[in-house]
């Protein structure tokens, strides 16, 4: 979302900000980019806020923050932990704490006020809170990792096996591994004083669900996020004050396998096992008299097998309701037949989960129910999504119900799991009491549109066999519950459909990692975290998820500095599938992009040394500054089936990426004040650029390598092209697109750069032409062939995934190109906004908004033969440059007033635009054509 166009003729200038804000308030308080974070993993939290100002041109001139360990103190305007005093600063994003030392496990309260340029101050904001997590092992008060069973040491596979063939090679006798009982744990305790605060700190591996007195705590799904468990695991923090009752209380926990233990049954992409599922927990209870009570896991807890009889992140889940033990989560339950929990004597580093958890985001009802030729009942949910099903069923016998999810159907309407991993199913055995039961899987998920049911019939259908009857089957779309921050809609139905197509793929692959697909692999392939970053962040606030992704990459980094293609690295692939520069470079590119979007440089500070190690690794792999290995432009459109690059050498794309990494490192070194490093990376970048052009530029043909779209786009975007050749290379790119009848040939690496280069050079009409077609592989092709989420291949092949993240780069153009919301080159966190819509083709209007760290930005435009209208909203404490398609200011009005009379600076550019500089507020521009 950067605007790189230069400014030219200054036409008119008057003082900016003549209208000071008359009144303002502070709202949307955030600590570490979350409203009320619990269990922070830092003693130096950062505070952010936004300002609601009447009128226009609000600029913050100062702020004051109060932090206290008591809300009563704040009510009296006393910050006993930190009173910043009045600080002269316009910064309102990620202001660092500078008060007394914070304590692990403690909760704090804060509020803020600010001043405008005229010296007027706001009322104090509402009070917000944050709490600190457990920062060392001693903070856990002796809590142990407990389990129901001992680990089977001969079956431990912390480095996973890839697929069935490697499993057979490792275990030639075909022995099943990873088969442990799925445990549930309970512990009863007594409180006889008034509870002030109760907090649960819990990690259950692979996944857990926590209950107190029979009530599930929180709405999260698949907690905790998956990691490289021998390096670190995540714990969750829950405020459970309201769940603790006077007298006896019971904690109950159920565990699933997740990625911690993957059994060798049904489908598995990867086979890995760290041992039996296990639990570590501390419940800290603070009483009003100041005393504390800590309940921690140990051998005094009780354990039993749960009704979950099969749990696999890859193969599905089975649940037998007849194995339920009524009341086991409640006080008074007789657990004499339960086992004592076992101490595993296992250790790993525990970190607080700071990324947004997974939730059920949507419920999806069937659009059609029918019987297929196999006699199964098929539910068509109308949408391919990540998630599970929920069923309501009545049964007179304990009949096993098998539920097959699938993206596609074969011609006979049976499920097609070829591209999504087979066999996978949900299994449920109801009780035989004739009562309605509700069930949904707890510890697995899949990507699907269709559901085929065996062993049950829809209620009201013929049921001669007396099978269980399903009163309702609903799809539950599960994904990372990151805030939606961007919206886009335009007058062209096809583009709105493409927007939805990409959005479903983004949502379906936002888990605790950014997966490639929500079924077959569920792995954190790293290339998409930077190639898709702008597109994803236009729609969702991923600031917290990327903090986890960076930690995953650091945990996966090898001794020689190599960053593998996936993180967490649950399996070691081979060749380019383990080590490819365009994938590992996410470790360099991601934190730079995070800094630009959110103003967060802490990731750069934290991982700078390890990022240097990766640059050194790439340098060690280079031959005369050329890096030539890996997968290259994956999934490009060549003569062969999709896969490794066909039209562009991996040397060109890898070296271009290497150069881009080095130039980012130079910028980050300057940001951190590391002048010697900045000089070193400048010199290295110059050497790579020279070598790149020497190797790949063909002076006789005036083109890069084979003149592929990817070669031209990457060279232009990375600024590898000498200035005298830039126009020629741009012409080559556009010419190749036209020669291919406006079709793309790039893969997932090249396409994002192609879109960016065309937009930067105001060639959005070319982007429009490329995506306004149905008859060649691309988005229109996928839609024409029935896709409801982005597919793995441009061709939408049925044998590949039909819900895949990696090719959704047009989403970024919808927001920054067609919609026109971006930021200036040197802007951070959208402090200096650029509104520059590029209408294209027959699109007559577009409505675009983005909730930036400073507040909401709006760009709504509409054009006709007579005029062009643009409604703009800029948040307080930010400014904007607005591009209007006219060179004569006499043709421009704002809210009915001629631009020359509107007290707004403006200037002309490129004999095409008038650029108006505005402050915060709402504006309505009209340009007569």
Task: Annotate each language-model stretch with its function.
Residues 198-202, 212, 388-407, 451-456, ...:
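Alpha-helical support elements that line or immediately flank enzyme active sites
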Residues 24-107, 111-520, 528, 544-547, ...:
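Extracellular/oxidizing-compartment recognition motifs
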Residues 173-180, 199, 217, 225-229, ...:
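Alpha-helix capping and helix-loop boundary segments enriched in small/acidic/polar residues
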Residues 271, 275-282, 294-332, 351-363, ...:
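Non-catalytic C-terminal accessory modules of carbohydrate-active enzymes
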Residues 1-25:
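Bacterial Sec-dependent N-terminal signal peptides
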Residues 215, 219-230, 411-425, 543-644, ...:
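Helix-terminus loop motifs that line ligand-binding clefts
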Residues 251, 319-320, 521, 539, ...:
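C-terminal capping/lid segments that line or modulate ligand- or cofactor-binding pockets
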Residues 207, 298-305, 450, 458-501, ...:
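Active-site acid/base region of carbohydrate-active enzymes
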């Amino acid at each position: 979302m950067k605007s790189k166009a230069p400014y030219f003729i200054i036409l008119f200038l008057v003082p900016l900000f003549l209208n000071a804000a008359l009144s303002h308030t502070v709202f949307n308080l955030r600590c570490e980019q979350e409203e009320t974070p619990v269990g922070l993993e830092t003693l130096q939290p950062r505070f952010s806020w936004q300002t609601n100002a009447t009128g226009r041109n609000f600029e913050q001139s100062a702020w004051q923050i109060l932090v206290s360990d008591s809300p009563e103190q704040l009510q009296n305007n006393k910050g006993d932990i930190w009173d910043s005093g009045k600080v002269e600063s316009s910064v309102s994003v990620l202001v660092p704490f500078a008060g007394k030392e914070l304590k692990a496990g403690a909760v704090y309260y804060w509020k803020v006020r600010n001043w405008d340029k005229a010296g007027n101050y706001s009322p104090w904001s509402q009070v917000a809170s944050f709490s600190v997590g457990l920062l060392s092992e001693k903070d856990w008060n002796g809590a142990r990792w407990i389990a129901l069973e001992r680990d089977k040491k001969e079956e431990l596979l912390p480095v996973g096996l890839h697929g069935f063939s490697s499993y057979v090679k490792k275990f030639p006798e075909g022995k099943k591994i990873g088969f442990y009982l799925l445990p549930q744990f309970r512990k009863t305790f007594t409180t006889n004083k008034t509870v002030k605060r109760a907090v649960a700190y819990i990690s259950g591996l692979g996944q857990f669900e926590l209950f107190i007195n029979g009530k599930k705590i929180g709405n999260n799904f698949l907690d905790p996020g998956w990691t490289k468990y021998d390096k670190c695991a995540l714990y969750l923090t829950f405020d459970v004050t309201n769940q603790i009752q006077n007298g006896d209380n019971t904690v109950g926990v159920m565990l699933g396998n997740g990625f911690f233990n993957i059994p060798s049954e049904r489908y598995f992409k990867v086979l890995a096992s760290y041992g039996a599922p296990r639990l570590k927990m501390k419940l800290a209870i603070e009483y009003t008299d100041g005393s504390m009570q800590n309940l921690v896991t140990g051998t005094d807890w009780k354990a039993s097998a749960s009704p979950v009889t099969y749990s696999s992140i890859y193969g599905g889940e089975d649940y037998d309701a007849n194995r339920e033990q009524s009341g086991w989560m409640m006080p008074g339950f007789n657990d004499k037949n339960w086992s004592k929990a076992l101490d595993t004597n296992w250790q790993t580093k525990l970190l607080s989960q700071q990324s947004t958890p997974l939730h059920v985001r949507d419920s999806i009802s069937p659009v059609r129910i029918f019987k297929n030729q196999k006699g199964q009942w098929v539910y068509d949910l109308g949408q391919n999504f990540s998630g599970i099903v929920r069923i309501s069923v009545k049964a007179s016998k304990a009949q096993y119900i098998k539920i097959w999810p699938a993206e596609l159907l074969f011609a006979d309407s049976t499920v097609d799991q070829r591209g999504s991993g087979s066999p996978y199913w949900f299994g449920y055995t109801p009780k035989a009491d004739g009562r309605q039961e509700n069930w949904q899987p707890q510890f697995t998920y899949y990507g699907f549109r269709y559901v085929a049911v065996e062993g049950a019939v829809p209620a009201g259908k013929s049921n001669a066999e007396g099978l269980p009857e399903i009163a309702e089957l609903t799809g539950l779309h599960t994904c990372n519950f990151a805030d939606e921050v961007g919206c886009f809609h335009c007058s062209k139905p096809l583009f709105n459909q493409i927007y939805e197509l990409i959005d479903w793929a983004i949502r379906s692959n936002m888990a605790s990692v950014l997966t490639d697909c929500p079924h077959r692999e569920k792995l954190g392939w790293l290339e998409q975290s930077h190639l898709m970053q702008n597109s994803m962040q236009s729609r969702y606030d991923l600031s917290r998820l990327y903090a986890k992704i960076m930690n995953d990459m650091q945990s996966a980094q090898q001794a020689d500095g190599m960053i593998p293609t996936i993180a967490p690295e649950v399996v070691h692939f081979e060749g380019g599938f383990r080590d490819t520069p365009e994938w590992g470079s996410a470790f360099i590119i991601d934190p730079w992009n995070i800094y630009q979007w959110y103003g967060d440089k802490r990731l750069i500070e934290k991982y700078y040394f390890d990022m240097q190690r990766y640059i050194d690794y790439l340098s060690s792999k280079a031959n005369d500054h050329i890096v030539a290995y890996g997968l290259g432009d994956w999934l490009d459109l060549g003569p062969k089936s999709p896969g490794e690059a066909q039209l562009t050498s991996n040397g060109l794309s890898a070296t271009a990426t290497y150069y881009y990494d080095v130039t980012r490192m130079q910028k980050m070194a300057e940001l951190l004040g590391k002048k010697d490093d900045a000089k070193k990376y400048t010199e290295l970048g110059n050497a790579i650029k020279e070598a790149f052009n020497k190797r790949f530029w063909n002076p006789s043909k005036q083109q890069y390598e084979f003149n592929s779209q990817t070669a031209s786009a990457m060279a232009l975007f990375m600024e590898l092209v000498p200035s005298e050749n830039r126009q020629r290379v741009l012409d080559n790119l556009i010419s190749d697109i036209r020669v291919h009848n406006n079709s793309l040939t790039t893969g997932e690496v090249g396409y994002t750069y192609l879109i960016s280069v065309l937009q930067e050079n105001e060639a959005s009409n070319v982007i429009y032409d490329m995506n306004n077609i149905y008859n060649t592989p691309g988005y229109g092709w996928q839609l024409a062939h029935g896709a409801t989420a982005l597919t793995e291949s441009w061709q939408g092949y049925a044998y590949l995934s039909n819900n895949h993240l990696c090719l959704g780069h047009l989403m970024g153009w919808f927001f920054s190109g067609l919609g026109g919301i971006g930021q200036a080159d040197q802007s951070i966190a959208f402090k200096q906004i650029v509104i520059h819509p590029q209408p294209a083709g027959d699109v007559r209007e577009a409505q675009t908004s983005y909730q930036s760290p400073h507040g909401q930005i709006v760009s709504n435009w509409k054009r006709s033969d007579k005029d062009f209208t643009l409604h703009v909203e800029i948040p307080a404490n930010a400014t904007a440059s607005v591009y209007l398609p006219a060179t004569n200011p006499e043709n421009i009005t704002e809210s009915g007033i001629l631009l020359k009379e509107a007290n707004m600076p403006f200037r002309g550019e490129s004999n095409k635009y008038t650029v108006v500089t505005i402050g915060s507020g709402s504006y309505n521009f009209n340009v007569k054509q």
